[in-house]
């Protein structure tokens, strides 16, 4: 198979540009390796060079086990490119060797309260947070979406779901504090929550609940039947 020279490809078809636009998951192994190699030679495009490496070593595992000397023997690679490839593969190996992170599982509103109460109960301004969850209701991240005033916070669906998409969240639980200490939801709280639930349904990220934190007490809008 013949691969084109990168500069001859339309911008939207080039590996680096595609990765910036669509993410690494959209690229083939040859595309990713071409990005690592950066350039080809005067006779071979970087995509052809990447394909030649995979052809020689058969698969990613064999490529990762190759020594710098073995990589350097491929025409067009050389020691500099061999080191670049080996360094990137070593990072991947170390990541795979890391112990699995122990993540908190959210089973009920009390679990949420236990995570955020001490941080939010005494704040003098409203902080709007999202707990981003995976498909097993494990917490992937806790993100502060906005910081408002004494009695209000402005939350744009765009900003909320941009964070959730970036973290590959399957669902989320919304949290914000009432500096007054009273966790009773306002009409605005309920309207905003319903709006965010609707946005989540369109995007495919479920908003499971909205917890309001007061002074050592909280309200779950879902438990109260308000959403």
UniProtKB/Swiss-Prot annotation:
Q: Where does Zn(2+) bind?
A: 176, 178, 189
Keyword Glycoprotein found: no
Which ranges of the sequence are coiled-coil? none
Listed A to Z, the keywords are: Hydrolase, Metal-binding, Metalloprotease, Protease, Zinc
Q: Where is this motif: JAMM motif?
A: 176-189
Please state every residue range assigned to the domain named MPN: 105-227
Full protein name: UPF0758 protein Dred_2549
> Signal peptide span per the entry?
none
Origin species, per record, is: Desulforamulus reducens (strain ATCC BAA-1160 / DSM 100696 / MI-1)
Q: Which GO molecular-function terms appear in the entry?
A: metal ion binding; metallopeptidase activity
InterPro entries per record: MPN, RadC_JAB, RuvA_2-like, UPF0758, UPF0758_CS, UPF0758_N
One Pfam family matching this protein:
UPF0758_N
Q: Does the keyword Protease apply?
A: yes
Q: One of this protein's GO BP terms?
A: proteolysis
Annotated family: Belongs to the UPF0758 family.
| Domain of life the protein comes from | Bacteria
């Amino acid at each position: 198979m013949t691969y084109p020279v990168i500069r001859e490809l339309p911008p939207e078809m080039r590996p680096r540009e595609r990765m910036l636009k669509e993410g690494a998951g959209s690229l083939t192994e040859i595309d990713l390796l071409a990005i690592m190699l950066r350039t080809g030679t005067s006779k071979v495009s970087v995509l052809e060079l990447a394909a030649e490496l995979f052809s020689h070593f058969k698969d990613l595992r064999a490529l990762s086990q190759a020594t710098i000397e073995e990589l350097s023997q491929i025409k067009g690679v050389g020691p500099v490119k061999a080191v670049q490839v080996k360094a990137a593969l070593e990072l991947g190996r170390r990541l795979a060797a890391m112990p699995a992170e122990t993540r908190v599982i959210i089973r009920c509103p009390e679990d949420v309260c236990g995570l955020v109460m001490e941080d939010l109960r005494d704040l003098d301004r409203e902080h709007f947070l999202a707990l981003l969850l995976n498909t097993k209701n494990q917490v992937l991240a806790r993100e502060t979406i906005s910081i408002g005033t004494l009695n209000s916070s402005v939350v744009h669906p765009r900003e909320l779901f941009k964070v959730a998409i970036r973290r590959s969240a399957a669902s989320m639980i919304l949290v914000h504090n009432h500096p007054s200490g009273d966790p009773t939801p306002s009409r605005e709280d309920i309207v905003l929550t319903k709006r965010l639930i609707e946005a989540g349904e369109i995007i495919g990220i479920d908003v499971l609940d909205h917890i309001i934190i007061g002074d050592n007490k909280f309200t779950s809008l879902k438990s109260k039947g308000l959403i």
